[in-house]
Structures are given as C-alpha cells and as structure tokens.
Amino acid sequence: MDFSFSEEQIAFRETARQFSEKALAPFAAEWDAESLFPKDAIREAGALGFCSLYCDEEHGGMGLSRLDAALIFEQLSQGCTSTAAFITIHNMATWMLTRFGSDAIRARWAADLMSGEKLASYCLTEPGAGSDAASLSTTAKKDGDDYVLNGAKAFISGAGDTDVLVLMARTGGPGAGGISCFAVPADTRGISYGRNEAKMGWKSQPTRAVILEDARISADCLIGEGGQGFRIAMAGLDGGRINIASCSLGAAQAALRQAQQYVQERKQFGQAIGDFQTVQFTLADMATELVAAQQMVRLAAWKLDQNHSDKSMLCAMAKRLATDLCFNVCNQALQLHGGYGYISEYPLERYVRDTRVHQILEGTNEIMRVIIARNVLKDLSFL
C-alpha cells in the first residue's frame, strides 16, 4: 500500500498552496468582517482550473480525481475556509450539471461555470425539508414545453449572487422517486431571494432563501431524466462530503500551525507555555486527530474514485470524523491562545466559526451516523 503522492498531485497541491497564501489568506479577515463575496478571487481560482476540478475533460473540466480535488481544497481552506467551501459547492453543482445534463445544458453553462466567470448554487434544502430531503415540496409542473416552479429553498450558498441554480423539485408523486433536477437560470422571472442571512461563520459567501412563484423554465432545463433528481442530488453529496471534510482539514492545519508558533512565543511563569506537558499533550492530540482525519478523508476519496460499493458509507464516515475532529482542533487552538484566541486580531475565532457549520451541512453528522449504521447492520465486510 503506497501512501505517497504522485508528482502531479504534489504540483497541484503546491499551486493551490501558493494561490491560497497569495489570493485568499491576506483578505480572509476583511471578507469575514465585512461579509464580502470575493467573486474576483473565485474567478482567479477558475483560471487555475479550481472551479472544475473533477469535471470530465471531454466537457472542458480538469478531469482530476476526487483525491486530487481533496488535496487542493485542503490547501485552499488554509487561506480562507469560507471561500474555499463555496468553491467546493460550485464544483459540486458544476459537476452535476455537466455529468448528468444534456448537450444543450452543457453548451449553455459549462464553459462559464468551469472558468469561474459564472457561478452555481446547489438547491436542495427547504424550510420544511432538511435532513428528510426526500420530503421536499417545491414543485415543477409540466406546462407544454415548459416547467412551472413553485416553492422555496432555504440556506442556499451563493443565492442572489450566482448565475444558475442546480435545483431539485417534485415532478411526480411523494418520496425520492418523484424528484427531478433542473438547471434554472438564476434571473428567471418569478424567482426572488431572501435577505443575506446573518450567520455565525461562512461570512464571505452569501446565504439566502430562494422563492419560486410561477417561475417558468424551458423543459430542456431538466438535468437527466424525470424522477432521477434525488439520485443525482445524492451523487453530488457523496463528493460534497469529501469536499467539506477537506475544508475542515485545511482550517485545522492552519489552526495547529498558529498554535504551534504561539505556544513557543508566549511566556508564563518564566517559560514558554509550550514547555508545559499539558500543552504538549494537547498539541499531540491535535496533531494525531488531524492525521487520522486526513487518512479517513483520503481513503473515502479513493473509494469514490474507484466507485466502490461502500463509497457512500466511507464518504459519510470521512465527513463525520473530519468535521468533528477538525472543529475540536480549531477549538483547542483557540483555547491555547487564551483570551487572544477570542479576539479577531487572531484568526482562531474565525476558524472555529467557519468550521462549526461543517458538522451541519452536506448532511448533519447525525445523519452521517444513520447512513453508517445502516451499512454496519447489513454487512461488516468493509472491515
């Protein structure tokens, strides 16, 4: 078993690190403080291929593996976790559109989405349908050559500032089989957006409700076939869980580096606090948990690349483990800074705020446990 990276992976990771240090990290605190959505930086990321990492080359994407993408997102998140997380969502939505969409849909959207000139939102969650996503009530009713959309989506990243909504709506009966997926132009008449939500973290990306009132779209906006929407949405989420776990890894690495430096500089009782065994034990646990989370994420990404039968379970495991452990690493790094960790002069409080939501979105960590447990009860052959 070889855990080393290829020369290509090392090069991609280094490019991402340099971009993160130059284009994200110096501005992350400002974007957070002023709730600025850095579209220019995202376009710069697109110019490097970071907006189409695992989209097929035949459709204009980079054609990288999910493991490659995980390594890149990990580096981007060290510069600005919130912005990196949006880039992962854009990648997921763009992949869904290009992987399952028609030639006409790809011709309309693919090039601009992959370059970062236009941006995509993923629209699944509703006010009354969160963890129970298959119960969504937004409808898409066929009317001649069109579909007419009615309903509402909640907590949509980028909504109001993006160009296309990859949106799940009910075209048939109840349950998952009645859901279809659409590429909806964001400026369609009948679509309006709620206020930009005031959030604990992820302040560099807007989060709004999407309200659909007799929003009419052409039937050729349908992604895949009718009734396939839930399957398409879940296919996107397997990768999305790896992506968000990778963002947690990046934030935790940044927090650990900050803590490592601080405990060697900060003196109390006549010596650096890093000389105290309790601090050393804390750092040891942080590093151990971070490495364990890294390996879990990379295993799950590899399983997804191999289309292994237990890929969805492994993605759920990786998301649950990495987002929990990495939040703890960020929180411990803040604790090691004492009062300084709590003020915005240092980035620790931002790392904590930005990683907290990772335990909620792309499926709550409680739902991840449900997915894992279902598989465990069926078969333990994955061990």
Where are these regions (language model features)?
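A short, Trp-centered hydrophobic/proline-enriched beta-strand micro-motif
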Residues: G116-L124
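Short glycine/proline-enriched turns and hinge-like loops at secondary-structure junctions
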Residues: L64-S65, D132-A134, G158-T162, A176-G178, ...
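A short core secondary-structure module
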Residues: D146, N150-Y193
